[in-house]
């Protein structure tokens, strides 16, 4: 690691015109991050011929105080305080000379807390990811992880409800919650949509949800959907004696429309509303604030996240989104299934779940966690597992994801050959059988298939589900995997 080559204040600096970022003070290998610093860890692929330390300094500069040339107004402020400081650039394992992959570097950059507006995800992201991803000095850039200091976390409200209070409201403890996404997600009339909701809840699910792109279309106005869904929720609750819910998607074109829809959902007695990630950070924080004020659970669908999280060398890791959304104040977020149809390496998904559920998340390189993170008493976020899962995978889902999770069987409920209610029954019986086996001390992972077969002897819907989907899985290689086993590389 090279030493600092900063050109000091004075004639040499201000007559230099354009000087490398490394010499402008943005590369400080001797810097010791303060407890109050925000630290971002980027995966940098420098352009050919660009020194990795210069690339790291360029990212630090362009994400804080720098522009492309020296400016005289630097002398009117405390640049030494406000400059971001790149202090490490470590070669990523299995890249560079002697490998088939071009060289990539993990660059650690520290930002003074005063650079950011308190309690604003929008302002935080405007600096960290606002301009640097199009910078010519880097061929590719990915934000892998961040350490958020307690001093900054305390300026955010965090989840409006949290896992503990949600379980108390539902009176459901010791097991994952069960849900489903209404299918087909587009095209149903309001009445038929409500019927799907009723059948699924009556069969034993705790929740049903709108999908990300059901808002207010010609085939079903949002108000009709809300009315029919809440009628279904109330009837199912009365029939089963259990607390039920439906995630009413209030995503809309404007904040005024979103507030109107949320208020209407509340007036109908809904306990939960839903928004999509694509509404943006300000809208998410605004709805989280509304949800806390109005005693509502806020579900976030991560619609759009893979446009920037899927590729390993460019964009942003989903674990960063998990951190930001916990700060922003959502109660639920889709975080992967491991065994379903969507991208998800088991180790990476474990890191996502730990980020959402831990009070303190320790460094764990095998799970992609590069920093110790104290969550400053922010409530936990309930992870949601959805996409290509079915009753035959119940033992695997509990093994990988634990019990603080919402398992959403959309096609695995509504695609059941005996009907929607039978699909819900199959999932509920499979879950109860697996939890009972776990609580009895059985090796439910090894014995899982047999446990399900035994339960299916007394439950025809579960037998039909197992016969229909058998051992269907989606075994594709993940694009986002751990880079190394634990080493000293990630120590701050």
Curated annotation (Swiss-Prot):
Binds 1 Mg(2+) ion per subunit. Keywords: Calvin cycle, Carbon dioxide fixation, Lyase, Magnesium, Metal-binding, Monooxygenase, Oxidoreductase. Transmembrane segments: none annotated. GO terms for molecular function: magnesium ion binding; monooxygenase activity; ribulose-bisphosphate carboxylase activity. Substrate binds at residues 131, 181, 185, 302, 334, 386. The active site is at 183 (proton acceptor), 301 (proton acceptor). One of its GO terms (biological process) is reductive pentose-phosphate cycle. The basic functional RuBisCO is composed of a large chain homodimer in a 'head-to-tail' conformation. In form I RuBisCO this homodimer is arranged in a barrel-like tetramer with the small subunits forming a tetrameric 'cap' on each end of the 'barrel'. Belongs to the RuBisCO large chain family. Type I subfamily. HAMAP family: RuBisCO_L_type1 (MF_01338). NCBIfam families: PRK04208.1. This is Ribulose bisphosphate carboxylase large chain. The lineage of its organism: Bacteria, Pseudomonadati, Pseudomonadota, Gammaproteobacteria, Chromatiales.
